[in-house]
Amino acid sequence: MVDIFTSEFTVGESITTDPIPESDFIPNSGNLFPKFPDQIRKTAVEVWLFDAIAEDGSSAITISFFRDALAAPAGFRIAVNASWSDGTIWGKPLIFPKSLITSKGPDVGSGAVTGVWRTDEDSSSHATFEVAADLSTAKVTFDVPGKVVGTLELKSLGFHPLPRSAREAEAAPSIYWMRSIAKAAATVDMVFTSPSADGESTTERPLVIGKDENPAFGGVDRSWESVGWTQAVTDSVFLRAKSGPYDLHFMLLVGKAEQDYRLTASASLYRDGELVCAPHDVLHHTEDGITTGAAAATTTTTRGDVDTLVVKKLFEGEGLPAPFRHQNVGYQLEYTSGGPDGKTWVFETRHQRAWYRKPTGPGTGSSGFIVSVTGGEAGKGKSFQGWGYEGQVVLPE
């Protein structure tokens, strides 16, 4: 039996200041249907993220469909950021007053999900995403004349598992981040339109990724929270990368000092498609190089108990400085698997090409980079190289 579940938002009616309970987390599901299906509180955020990057780092795109109040009363936004090998970038929000999401399947956690961000009923300007019920494929389509038209298609390479519990999906208290499709082969065929410098004309530029002899990878991420980051978080770092046989993913949120919560991450490391490390606990490097357990007064995690991740900002050597408070040139990541036979893998990312830069205040904002990635298993003497993309968000402390 196939049921149809529908969540339809109109910007003037669907955002409220009242508390709105979120729907339950669904184990072993992509959790793609909205957690706030009827209305969303002004402080809450839901997002569906799709991305692709050429394996040689030459070009990339990220697309994020949002349901939140940031663009209200104009509408609900889609953040689109594209990067070409010559350093050209295209980054603009697309804003639509309506958002419709449907799930077709035996239950709300197992259906094929379609999202449509659109203008009025009779308008052809819209953007859609579609994710198969078995999470095998995803497709994003833009039909926004004068801005962007074309498609991003993803075919899953089977890099699961999905979270078995809400805690496994928590990147921070009550902030959820998961990879509905963790790794996919990607193809992009889009055309972007930009105004000329004098504003008298426009230019069009195609973005083609993952075709011919230049393969590409990407994925689908899903996040939601009832309280926005600005109230609880000072920093975040996102990475999707490939280095030889390794695929690296992580999302790290650092809370404000008064939150005093145990530092966690949504992270995974694969070798040849096999999950070898899935840290949820983070052992944090402070900026003076001292290794501590985050929220040391309450954490009991030690190396060897569980999979862990150490994240250290790099300030010396190759790389472009991040534009906001930290000005780091990359990161060192240390994945350690738990148990008596635990192994450690160490990787370095370096900012090679600036992507987007969006200031929000003194020393704060969001930025993105195409990054080189180097590393492998510690003590093995063999290092692998690859590429990925990294996003940083810096918020007031």
Curated annotation (Swiss-Prot):
Q: State the reactions this protein catalyses.
A: (2S)-3-[(2S)-3,5-dioxo-4-[(2E,4R,6R,8E,10E,12E)-4,6,12-trimethyltetradeca-2,8,10,12-tetraenoyl]pyrrolidin-2-yl]-2-hydroxy-2-methylpropanoate = sch 210972; (2R)-3-[(2S)-3,5-dioxo-4-[(2E,4R,6R,8E,10E,12E)-4,6,12-trimethyltetradeca-2,8,10,12-tetraenoyl]pyrrolidin-2-yl]-2-hydroxy-2-methylpropanoate = sch 210971
One Pfam family this sequence matches: DA_C
Keywords attached to this Swiss-Prot or TrEMBL record, sorted alphabetically, are:
Isomerase
- Listed GO molecular functions? isomerase activity
Q: What is its EC number?
A: 5.5.1.-
Note the coiled coil stretches, chain numbering. none
Which pathway does the database say it acts in?
Answer: Secondary metabolite biosynthesis
Protein task: Diels-Alderase; part of the gene cluster that mediates the biosynthesis of the tetramic acids Sch210971 and Sch210972, potential anti-HIV fungal natural product that contain a decalin core. The PKS module of tasS together with the enoylreductase tasC catalyze the formation of the polyketide unit which is then conjugated to 4-hydroxyl-4-methyl glutamate (HMG) by the condensation domain of the tasS NRPS module.
**Could you say which protein family the record assigns here?**
Belongs to the Diels-Alderase family.
What name appears for this protein in its UniProt entry?
Diels-Alderase tas3
User: Which organism is the protein's source?
Assistant: Hapsidospora irregularis
The gene that this protein is the product of is tas3
